[in-house]
Structures are given as C-alpha cells and as structure tokens.
C-alpha cells in the first residue's frame, strides 16, 4: 500500500493551468508545483508570466513553460493545442480555470437582466464552456497516454444555486445570467466527460463559493451571515481540493463536483 506522501507526489507529471496569472490561477499553480508537478502556464496576451515563473521556479524548482493564448478565440486555442501536442513531455493534468467572473469588466455583463447583452452572453459561454470543451477534446489523446491523468474544471456554486438577490441590495454588484448558465453547463459537462473518458482519465469539478475580493462591506457581512463557516472563501481555501483531484489520492474518484463553499449549499 502506498503512503499518503507517495500518493500526493506529482513529481514527473506535467500540468497545464489556464488563467494561470489570475488570483486563483496563481494559487493553483503554486499548489501543483509544491507537489512536484512541472507546469505549463496559459493566460491571455499581455499577462505577466515572468514574476510568477521566477517565484515558482525559485520556491519549488519545477520546470515551467508559458503560453499566451486568448482562449475566447478558437484559432488561438488550436495553436496552443498544436504547440503542446508537439512537445515530448506529455500532459498528465489539465486545469480549466480561465473564465469570465462576476466582476469581469464587460459591456452588458454586471448589469440588470434587461441590460445584459446577447453578445456578452455568447462571449461568456465561449470562454467559460466552449473553450473547455475544445481543450478537453484536443488534449484527450495526450491525457489518455499519461499516468494518473486528471482533468479539473473550476466551476462555481452559482452553477449549482440561483443567486440570493438580497445579498446585493444597496451595492453596485450583480450576478450575470451567463455566468451561472456557463458554470452549470460546466458541471454537467464534467459528469458527461467523466463517463466518456473513464477509466483512462479522471474528470472532476471544483465549485468555489464566494471568494473575498474587496466586495462592499454590506455584501461581505450578509454573505458571511448566511454561510455556516461565517466568512467568505479565499483562493487558498481551494488548495486542498486542487491537490486532491490532481494526485493519486483521488484515483478512484471521477465525475464529482466538490463545492468548497463553507457550507453555503447545505441550507
């Protein structure tokens, strides 16, 4: 029987993380690097990979490459997959983290329903769902050939539950329809893909609860009061779930959606 240390060791495995320079992406990259995985970091053109790569290399000593890619554009996704497929290092772990979120600066996004635009709805579904379908499909041959292959999709509790609008009263915050729709679709796609790629590739999903990012005090207070753990989440709260699904501790787990929400969904 392998030890827990052996089961959690990702040395010799390679992980691709999208949205790698964002708040959650950096935490995911650090988590996988700490467990020994070599990394391919992906984010949109103009992203600052240099400081993140330097920090990860100095701290964990893993091999790191990075790729600029606007995942909203199919042509750039195709180029990314071609570059990765040409490499000889393989791919063991795919983390689909990049997404438009509730605070994204988009026209017709974080506004009342009557003002949400069809163009922005389409953009959100393209990045939050279609791009993930595309990457999973394109990387399937590499993953099927790899040891301990795992796909981790980052969804949201808003893909599971409707928004509680009273939390937003008196603030300029919103909850776009396309966000919940795309994340709900991602959760179901995770289940579908898990049955399709098993047993060679495990496919699981993490649904964070609300993450604290300097929201208005009244929103934070209301959110915390409704949450059994009495606070909002932090990016660091996702580390355990990422590590679990990435490594062999979860080698008999697939098709699951793990809500890391402080108990939000239990009532």
Regions found by a protein language model. Name each.
Residues 114, 118-120, 144, 152-198, ...:
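Catalytic loop of short-chain dehydrogenase/reductase
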Residues 14, 21-22:
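Conserved glycine-rich cofactor-binding loop
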Residues 97-109, 263:
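Conserved NAD(P)H cofactor-binding loop of Rossmann-fold oxidoreductase domains
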Residues 148, 198-202, 253-255:
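Short, small/polar-rich loop/turn modules that mediate ligand/substrate recognition or access, typified
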Residues 79-86, 105-126, 222:
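Active-site Tyr-X3-Lys motif and surrounding loop/helix of classical short-chain dehydrogenase/reductase
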Residues 2-7, 163-166, 170, 243, ...:
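Short C-terminal tail/terminal secondary-structure segment
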Residues 35-51:
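Conserved glycine-rich Rossmann-like NAD(P)H-binding loop of the short-chain dehydrogenase/reductase
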């Amino acid at each position: 029987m392998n030890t827990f240390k052996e089961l959690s060791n990702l040395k010799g495995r390679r992980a691709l993380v999208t949205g790698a320079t964002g708040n959650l992406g950096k935490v995911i990259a650090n988590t996988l690097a700490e467990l020994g995985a070599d990394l391919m970091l992906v984010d949109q053109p103009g992203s600052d990979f240099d400081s993140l790569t330097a920090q990860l290399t100095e701290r964990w000593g893993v091999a790191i490459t990075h790729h600029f890619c606007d995942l909203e554009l199919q042509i750039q996704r195709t180029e990314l997959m071609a570059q990765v497929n040409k490499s000889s290092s393989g791919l063991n772990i795919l983390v689909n983290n990049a997404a438009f979120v509730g605070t994204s600066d988009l026209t017709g996004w974080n506004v009342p329903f009557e003002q949400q635009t069809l163009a922005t709805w389409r953009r959100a579904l393209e990045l939050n769902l279609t791009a993930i379908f595309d990457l999973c499909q394109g990387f399937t041959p590499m993953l099927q050939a790899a040891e301990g292959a795992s796909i981790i999709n980052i969804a949201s509790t808003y893909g599971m539950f409707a928004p509680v609008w009273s939390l937003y009263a008196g603030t300029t915050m919103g909850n776009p329809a396309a966000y919940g729709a795309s994340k709900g679709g991602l959760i179901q796609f995770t289940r579908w893909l898990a049955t399709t790629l098993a047993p060679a590739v495990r496919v699981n999903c993490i649904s964070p609860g609300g993450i604290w990012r300097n929201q208005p005090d009244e929103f934070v207070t209301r959110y915390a009061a409704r949450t059994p753990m009495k606070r909002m989440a932090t990016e660091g709260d996702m580390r355990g779930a990422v590590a679990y699904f990435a490594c062999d501790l979860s080698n008999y787990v697939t098709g699951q959606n793990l809500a890391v929400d402080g108990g939000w969904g239990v009532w």
